[in-house]
Amino acid sequence: RSRRQRQMCIRDSFKAYSDDIGFDPVDLSDHPVQLAPEHIEALKKIVGEQNVSTTDYDRLSVAYGFTAYDILRLRHKRVDSVPDVVLYPETTGQVEQIVAYSTEHHIPLYVYGGGSSVTRGVEPVKGGISLDMRRNFNKVISFNEIDQTITVQAGMSGPDLEKTLQSAPELFGAKRQYTCGHFPQSFEYSSVGGWTVTRGAGQNSTYYGTIADIVLSQKYATPIGTIQTSHYSREATGPNLNQIMMGSEGTFGVLTEVTLRIFRWMPQNRKRFSYIFKTWDAAMKAAREMMQCECGYSSVFRLSDPEETNLMLKLYNVDETPLQPLLDKFGYKDMERCLFLGFTDGEKGYSRNVARNIAKIALKHGGMPLTGYVTRSWEKGRFNDPYLRDTLMDFGITTDTLECTVNWSNMEQVHADVRKICHALPNTVVT
C-alpha cells in the first residue's frame, strides 16, 4: 500500500473509538451558566477579564478528578456537575478577595490544583466558581538556603517545584541543588497545594517523610479572614494548627501559600538494591527488621506479595534475563516468591551503610540479590500506572489501587482479609 493508503487505513481504524477518546468538541448546552452576569463582571474586576472563563471546555476541564468513576463518566459524556465560571487567580490578594466575595454573596467555591484528586473533592456539585490554580498561581515566593526552606504558591506542580529546586544555584545563587523529596505516584499531575490539603505520602516517604513532615507553614484565605500558621518546625503548645489544616481538602478555606522543608539533592550517592524472598512470611520479617534495626532508613522501600511479584517480574522482563534460571535453580518459586526493592539517599557514608545493613538483613532471611537492574526498571515507570489505566480502559478493563495503614502486628491479617475479599469479586484480577 502507498503511504497515503496506510494513513487512511489508520484513520478508519479509529472510527469505532472516535466517540470515546476525547477528540470531539465539548458541548455543555444542557448545563448553561447559572451565575448572574453581575457576579461574573465583579469577578472580572478582581482577577482581570483575561483570567475569567465561561467556555464549555474550561468549565468541564475542572469538573472532575481522576478516579475511575470520573474517567468513565467523561468517556461516556456523562456530565453531572460543572462550575458556572472558572477563575485563574495570580496573587494571594486576588484569592482572598474571591473568597470574601463568594462568602458575601453565598456563591459555592471550589479549588482545582493538578487534577489528580481521587476523592471527588474537586467536583463542583453546586456549580458556582472554580479556582483553577494551574495557569497563574504557581510562583516561588521565597527561597531560604540557611533554613533550607522554600515558599511557593499552592498551584505549583510537582515537576516545576523539583526543577526549581534542582536549579537553585542558577535561580537563587544557592551553593547546591535541592529536592523536595515528595514523589507521589500523581507527581506529574499534582500540585503542592493538593499534596498538602490531602495530607499525601510519596514513594520516598520512608526517608523524607510524608507531606505532613515536609510542610512547615501554610496560608489560607477563609470566610473569616486569612489564617497563617507558624513558620517553626516544632512548638511547645498545642493543638498544632499546621497539622489540623493539613488534610482538610478545602473545607477550612483556600490554601494559597506553602512553606516546605527542602533537602540536599545528592543523586550520586544513591544505592539501588533489589532482593527476592522465597515466601511472603520471610519477606515481611526481613522488612520489619530493616525498619526496626535503628540503622537508618532507605528512601524507597517497596515489598510486593507473590501476586504482585509475578506481574512485576514480567513487566521488568526478568523472566527473559539470566536471573530467571537462577531463581528456579535456588527454589524461588513462582507465585510464592516476593520481590523487595528500593534505594537509599543522603550523605555518601550514610547511604552506603544503610544499603549494607539492608543487604545483611535480607541475606539473613534468605533473600537473593537481584542487583540494581530491577530497581532501575521500576524507576523508569514509577509514574506510569495512571497511563496504563487509561489504556486498559480502551479494552474494557478498569484498574484501581487500595491504600491502608497497618501495624506490623496486624499486617499479615489485613493483607489476607483484603485479598480474600478482592478474589471473591467476579471478573476481578488481583495483583
Predicted feature residues:
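Single conserved hydrophobic/aromatic residue that forms the stacking wall/gate
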Residues: 1-6, 10
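Low-complexity, highly charged intrinsically disordered N-terminal segments
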Residues: 11, 22-60, 64-65
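C-terminal substrate-recognition/cap domain of FAD-linked oxidoreductases
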Residues: 11-16, 49-72, 284-431
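Soluble FAD-dependent oxygen oxidases
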Residues: 32, 76-109, 202, 226, ...
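Glycine-rich N-terminal segment of FAD-binding domains in flavoprotein oxidoreductases
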Residues: 35-38, 54-136
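Short beta-strand elements
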Residues: 131, 135, 216-220, 243-247, ...
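FAD-binding subdomain of flavoenzyme oxidoreductases
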Residues: 139-302
